Amino acid sequence: MPNLREIFVSNATNAWGDQAMKSFIDLNPDQVMDAVETLGVRCTGRMLQLNSMENRVYEIEIENGLPESMWPDPENSPAHPKLLVAKFYRPGRWSKEQIQDEHTFLHELKDNDLNVIAPLIYQSQTVWPNPTNDLFFSVFEKRAGRTPYDLPKEEWEKLGRLLARMHLIGETKPAKNRLTLNPATYGDSNINAILQSPYLTDKYREVWYQAAKNAMQYITPMFDGIKNIRVHGDLHFGNILYREMEGPLLLDFDDFLNGPAVQDIWLLTPGRDENAKQIRGWLLDGYEEMREFPYHELQLIEALRTLRYIHFTAWISKRFDDPSFKITFPHFGSDEYWSEQIGDLFEQTEILSTGSQHST
């Protein structure tokens, strides 16, 4: 990690180019429907923008349904599915090749009967440039369901079996164009980005940097010898739907990457108390029915939690020129915000230094 004096701090200009971001922020319904209609469908004009901070996502009604060549499941699809979900990707985050890695994984999962929503295929492609502004977009089948809460033991076990099946496929090969979750990518790189951000003020710069640096001294050696496989990467309950007779449906693989298997476990059971450990045990009981779980990775939970804190701050700082981020995170960059972040890092460093790690 570089010395603080070696890091050049500037008023960050948009790293993705003003024109690309302007096109993304100004994306309008006509542009969205025009892009979708290049795939051989016709929109009715009815469209609903869905909740997404990272991308622009829309539910779109189409006339006469999908052409049969695009049906996600020709044997089981409704005769004429009329609702699509179109995702327009934030410029600069993922290349077309990186998006394609995600789509390839989703189709591998779908082809092995895992309950996921894979992108629709048109003329052998799943990701296309918007003809009016070159933003990449994809389309998906619309699926409904409910967010799960208070799952009984048997449902935790069922979810564990699903995750194990996903990891069995994930370990067959790496995602060659995606990130690997490790101290360098989620720690050092994000720390440098935050230090170069104009939103980290001089008042807190040195103390925040020291707090992050101290935490990283414990985190970095913990990843030695850890096996990386393809994982969901952001698997909390907001990214799972339950459908009657089908069970859990995994959503939003936008943060898909190479990483330890435990990354897809701890966000579902993030607590430190005995109840969280019991639930994690149920999840892993089901997991073990399909794949051997690397229990030594449970020692990474607090390290992964700390890296997520750092990554989340960097994520906001890189996007704070987007008006939607200013609305959603109005206290970002304030004294209160940085005091809280520093306190969290101090707390995590204390936990890491005493070896107070998770176990089942």
Label every PLM stretch briefly:
Residues 91, 136-150, 191-199, 312-328:
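A glycine-centered beta->alpha junction motif in the catalytic cores
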Residues 123, 149-206, 228, 329:
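A cross-family kinase active-site recognition segment
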